[in-house]
């Protein structure tokens, strides 16, 4: 189903804790003309980085990254958090397209729900919040979402918005007409959007929801602009905290080449924790 990445160079003793990382990368979006190039590289790199720090890392890519598997991963993280409590540390990274759909439960000020584009469909942010609402607050979960959810772009424009010279492309997928029709008849879930202090996870995103997160050719290979800087900063500062990582990433982004503004969300007491 998906590959388990193991690094024999890990110097961490994980016997006392359960550390797991699920690293999702989707380049292939069949039938959309919106394939990406750097998302699988992101997943491999995040897996390598987390494994060095004592995590068992699973790489999920392209056709394996289905909606059902994505939801099962979230549920597994919740189950482990309740089984191991404070001894559990989970990481979930997602590199791929993001999109938006009409907000039917009134929890979004902009009238749109954000969604992750899996290989075969969408996982709506409401669904993610509902699953994670049962996550043990004594455990820890870091989510990295290197995708974008901007609703300011049209289908026709997106097809031409690819800079061959810069080899950069936004990680945004417009929702299909069929999907929008389906969402319009979806039953309301009445999920309340949580405040940061109520979040069970620490969330690092590639951009504001009004911006693009860029898939770009950097240092000889395709990768996410935000992921590139975040991974490099962590490697150079292994004891860095979440808030300091965000501050360091913001020194590089937004830039003229990549006008995206990474965001950090979560409880304040969690933001000052060391990542590893």
Language model features by range: what are they?
Residues 1-276:
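Cysteine endopeptidase catalytic domains of the caspase/legumain-like
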């Amino acid at each position: 189903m998906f590959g388990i990445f193991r690094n024999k160079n890990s110097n961490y003793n994980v016997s006392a804790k359960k550390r797991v990382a699920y690293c999702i990368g989707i380049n292939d979006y069949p039938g959309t003309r919106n394939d990406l190039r750097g998302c699988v590289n992101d997943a491999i790199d995040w897996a390598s980085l987390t494994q060095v720090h004592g995590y068992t890392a699973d790489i999920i890519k392209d056709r394996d990254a289905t909606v059902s598997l994505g939801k099962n991963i979230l549920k597994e993280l919740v189950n482990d958090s309740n089984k191991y409590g404070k001894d559990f540390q989970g990481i979930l990274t997602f590199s791929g397209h993001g999109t938006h759909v009409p907000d039917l439960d009134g929890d979004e000020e902009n009238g749109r729900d954000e969604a992750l584009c899996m290989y075969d469909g969408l996982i709506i942010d409401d669904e993610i919040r509902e699953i994670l609402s049962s996550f043990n607050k004594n455990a820890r979960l870091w989510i990295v979402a290197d995708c974008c959810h901007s609703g300011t772009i049209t289908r026709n424009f997106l097809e031409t918005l690819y800079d061959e010279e810069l080899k950069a492309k936004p990680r945004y997928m417009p929702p299909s007409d069929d999907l929008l029709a389906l969402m319009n008849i979806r039953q309301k879930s009445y999920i309340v959007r949580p405040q940061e202090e109520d979040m069970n996870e620490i969330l690092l995103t590639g951009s504001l929801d009004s911006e693009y997160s860029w898939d770009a050719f950097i240092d000889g290979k395709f990768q996410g602009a935000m992921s590139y800087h975040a991974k490099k900063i962590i490697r150079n500062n292994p004891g860095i905290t979440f808030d300091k990582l965000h501050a360091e990433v913001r020194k590089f982004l937004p830039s003229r080449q990549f006008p995206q503004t990474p965001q950090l969300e979560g409880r304040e007491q969690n933001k000052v924790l060391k990542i590893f």
